[in-house]
Amino acid sequence: MASLKSIKKRIVSVKNTRQITKAMKMVSAAKLRRAQENVVAARPYAKKLGEVLDRLAKSQDGSSSPLLQKRISQKALLVVVTSDRGLCGGFNANICKAAERFIREKKAEFAEISVTTVGRKGFEFLKNRQKIHKNYGNVLSNLSYPTAALLAQEVVEGYVAEEYDEVYLLFNAFRSVMSQDITLQQLLPIVPEETAEEEYVPEYIYEPSKGELLDELLPKHIEVQVFKALLESVASEHGARMTAMDSASKNATEMIGKLTLQYNRARQAAITTELMEIISGAESIKG
């Protein structure tokens, strides 16, 4: 049986760890509220912009925009969004596994698949497994639209220059504190959504012209989609970390209870042994 001193030391250590996990849970909860508000605000704008683009693209048959043109797919770019920090359960591991699965399943379809990572954890996992086109580190802790726009612009420039023929975005979409959905989204070429034949599509008058608006809005659409995906990932990260730290705190409390019971039993055994020795000594003196 472990000594009283070692058990007491473990109890103190676990209590200190519980204090840290509780503090991290509270910090994540505060950050989650702000991140969730940002996601809720971004979703309607991204959706409406997508709807406007769908109408424009469908009414502009044979558009000259390279962002709408499908070409022979030989090279693909996968943008993988993870976090810069750990201690968030399976948040990063699940995305990295999904990235590996995508690469494995698409190998026959593409001659070359490159990966751009957003977040240090994804880069560390994939750097020795796959060709890394570029890594964006330490951008999620203080995420801003200009940062997301820069990433999107670089992706668009590479696509227009035919460095890759298709671009996919892999990220955790926020659903709730307990739930995040791994989402794979085709970013380029932009594919308008299918509209049911019976669905009424109103006609709009566009100025200066549909073509000019389309050329202006398509890059903006990519920027918005990237920004929304990063916001979703940040909210998912905080939700996953909050859940993980809550679970760790509960496990620590349970362990403290078991160690305390073990300590009390060891202490009781030590007292009993000491009493037996005293009684034995007294008996030997009498004898």
From Swiss-Prot:
Entry's Gene Ontology BP terms: proton motive force-driven plasma membrane ATP synthesis
Membrane topology, as annotated: Peripheral membrane protein
Molecular function terms, GO-annotated: ATP binding; proton-transporting ATP synthase activity, rotational mechanism
Intracellular or extracellular location(s): Cell inner membrane
Gene3D superfamilies per record: 3.40.1380.10, ATP synthase, gamma subunit, helix hairpin domain (1.10.287.80)
Keywords tagged on the record: ATP synthesis, Cell inner membrane, Cell membrane, CF(1), Hydrogen ion transport, Ion transport, Membrane, Transport
SUPFAM superfamilies, A to Z: ATP synthase (F1-ATPase), gamma subunit
GO cellular component, one term: proton-transporting ATP synthase complex
Similarity field: Belongs to the ATPase gamma chain family.
Function as written in the Swiss-Prot or TrEMBL entry: Produces ATP from ADP in the presence of a proton gradient across the membrane. The gamma chain is believed to be important in regulating ATPase activity and the flow of protons through the CF(0) complex.
NCBIfam families attached to this UniProt entry: ATPsyn_F1gamma
Binding partners and assembly: F-type ATPases have 2 components, CF(1) - the catalytic core - and CF(0) - the membrane proton channel. CF(1) has five subunits: alpha(3), beta(3), gamma(1), delta(1), epsilon(1). CF(0) has three main subunits: a, b and c.
Protein's name in the database: ATP synthase gamma chain
Species of provenance: Geobacter metallireducens (strain ATCC 53774 / DSM 7210 / GS-15)
